[in-house]
Design a protein with these regions (language model features):
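Non-transmembrane alpha-helical segments in soluble domains
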Residues: 7-10, 115-122, 196, 200
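Active-site rim elements
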Residues: 104-109, 175-187
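Short beta-strand immediately N-terminal to the catalytic nucleophile in serine-hydrolase-like folds
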Residues: 26-28, 53, 101
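The feature captures the conserved acid-bearing segment of alpha/beta-hydrolase catalytic domains
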Residues: 58-159, 166-172
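Catalytic active-site module of serine/aspartate enzymes centered on a nucleophile-bearing elbow/loop
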Residues: 184-204
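A conserved short beta-strand
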Residues: 46-57
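Gly/Ser-rich "nucleophile elbow"/oxyanion-hole loop immediately N-terminal to the catalytic nucleophile
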Residues: 1-34, 41-47, 93
């Protein structure tokens, strides 16, 4: 399927160029964010960490109907989906760091999905061996919009393993994106910079 094709493209590029195999990441918006979740669960041996912007938890959308339902009001129980994602990892199971962005004004992907994605990965990473501290929430601002950052950190090291940015007033658009693009909001925190900083701290 598509995840296999994308993992294969990574292999082709790595075979042609000097790619650090320990620093390959996947991030996306909307359906692309849902695909990043799938890649993190099915190819944890390829992707070191993932970024999920306005997406859905693992297997929240298995057909058109479930996709529309999840987008409108949230997906299935995150614990259940987290266990399914862990099972999908198979012999390659490991802790996958995840950074999530979601807007409170998103009418395409309901805001509840952001917290569900984070909760799903907390469950998946816990099953993979992580011991996470209780969630810690801190307020912030960026680009003119405020946000709440919820962090789930390694209990021993304090290293953030799952982060969720809930951006106030952000619609279905890439947070901090260019004015030249579509589905972007330059008056919001710079998701690209934040994701890259998170990725840089989490090689495989």
């Amino acid at each position: 399927g598509e995840p296999q094709l994308l993992a294969g493209i990574v292999g082709d590029v790595a075979g042609a160029y000097a790619v650090d195999a320990h620093r390959v990441y996947a991030a996306g918006l909307s359906a692309g964010a849902a695909m990043a979740v799938v890649l993190g669960a099915t190819y944890p041996d390829v992707f070191a960490a993932i970024g999920v912007h306005s997406g859905l938890e693992y297997q929240a959308a298995t057909d058109v109907t479930s996709g529309l339902t999840a987008s409108a009001s949230g997906g299935p129980d995150p614990t259940q989906q987290g266990d399914a994602a862990y099972a999908a990892m198979g012999a390659y199971a490991r802790v996958v760091p995840v950074v999530v962005f979601q807007g409170t004004a998103d009418t395409t992907v309901a805001p509840a999905n952001g917290a569900q994605v984070a909760a799903q990965w907390v469950e998946t990473d816990t099953k993979a061996g992580a011991t996470l501290a209780a969630a810690a929430s801190t307020p912030g601002t960026g680009g003119g919009k405020s946000y709440t950052l919820t962090t789930y950190a390694d209990a021993a090291t304090g290293e953030p393993l799952v982060e969720e940015y809930l951006v106030s007033g952000l619609a279905h658009a890439w947070s901090g994106g260019s004015t030249a693009g579509t589905f972007t909001d330059p008056s919001a925190p710079d998701a690209s910079a934040i994701m890259w900083s998170f990725f840089a701290a989490h090689p495989r």
